């Protein structure tokens, strides 16, 4: 449930927000806008401090109603000398509703357009890290839902500015104690500026104890003083606390022009890199990413496993990209997806059940399917099924094309890489005859199951190879005949194979079902037995839809598509720097969840490369490191 807020009449458009939990107002009598500008922006020397910088990172303790973020975003947009990238990281233990966030901004008309954009993305805020994207990926809001001390325990970034906000120290002492400030200090570099509205002695003493040099400065009437300072500890900062050096944008070779490679290329290009994408095929998305249409839906599990949590982060990232780059109802559609739990009734986490604390936020993601939704599928009301709200279908190839069209990205087909040679601080990608295809300071291996061989070329001293396994899949599809469309639901269904019922193609309206799953097979040939396998699965998944398509399957009118996926034993992607190979990274192993993970992994790679805030928790990101994809040797290798 969202945090309860009371709105006190004060003569303004929205009223004054008040927290019953803490018995305190969300903003001072000055108004939130003036406090944000005078206390936080001015207190941290913004916008002057970020002028001409490639990126800037603000850390805030206490997101509240988002006013400080909105004011900072507006200042960034109005500044001709703004940094290319603005990161805003904010912690919040008790997130407010999207409606209350918008209502809070109504008092300030200049902020309403920003608040409306923010409101559209404030959904599904379960505990953990949520990345919200604005301005075409140039303004990145990382919301850390949970206790500030816990969320900042393992920092992955260095803040340039810190806003210390929250209810008064008397009302909410935990966010102002020395343990919180130690967590904040772990995210700071020498010279990081901090600002806050409180000058309480306990706050000043705790900050000083954590390495901050602070001073009182004149406030805006009726506030007499504010507090400003810098992180200047008298001791040497331990190396274990120093985040990776922010790598300057340069040249990058991405090997592979599927979902993984094209997503990486676009993310790096947004940060100023010149990216060359090489692929052995003559067209982009020629491999597993060439599926006519794929289902985008989160994974759920009773214990809310690592895979489940990562899948939600991936879905959010992909929805943002699809909405920004693709044509709705032509290239993709956020229809929602019904999961028919054929083999067993998939259980939701106990904390998601109705009446529990997380029920509202979880319901933005997944909830039990309704009898009406089941009826549309031709299934009985007793059928075990889930409804994924934030889900739909996408044409992967169209997304690949959009990413490869990003400024700064150059794609080259018929460019099979046979050798990677490092000379004079750069990598050369060579073809089979030894001709140079491209050279760059950074290489990203995103060639599906081909990434394993490339990793062995780049790092011949590696102990064990990446356990990337080839998995052949065959999907079946066809154009709707008279009467078949009416027999199908308006949304995709998955759970035992999948069906995307309505995909607009140049030839007409199509359906797509599948797919088969065969390990260690890379054959591109279509096989009749796989077509029948897909039909058999569809009969179980959606009997009514299968019945409507029987004539097409029996008369040979069904078409086929085949591709080779790449997976790891953990079913998680392999993402990160390759061991024993300087400036070679891996982004592969997404299996059948390329649509789920491609956008997230690309942003995670870019964040780790530049020392930026991560779009997921650090321990989740670490679970994807390539060394963990060497633990099991794939069969048949």
From Swiss-Prot:
One of its GO terms (cellular component) is cytoplasm. It is found in: Cytoplasm. It comes from the Bacteria. The keyword ATP-binding does not apply. Its cofactor is FAD. Coiled coil: none annotated. Its main location: cytoplasm. Residues 255-637 are annotated as: FAD-dependent cmnm(5)s(2)U34 oxidoreductase. Its EC number is 2.1.1.61, 1.5.-.-. The keyword Methyltransferase applies. Keywords: Cytoplasm, FAD, Flavoprotein, Methyltransferase, Multifunctional enzyme, Oxidoreductase, S-adenosyl-L-methionine, Transferase, tRNA processing. PANTHER family: SARCOSINE DEHYDROGENASE-RELATED, TRNA 5-METHYLAMINOMETHYL-2-THIOURIDINE BIOSYNTHESIS BIFUNCTIONAL PROTEIN MNMC. This is tRNA 5-methylaminomethyl-2-thiouridine biosynthesis bifunctional protein MnmC. It comes from Polaromonas naphthalenivorans (strain CJ2). The lineage of its organism: Bacteria, Pseudomonadati, Pseudomonadota, Betaproteobacteria, Burkholderiales. The gene is mnmC.
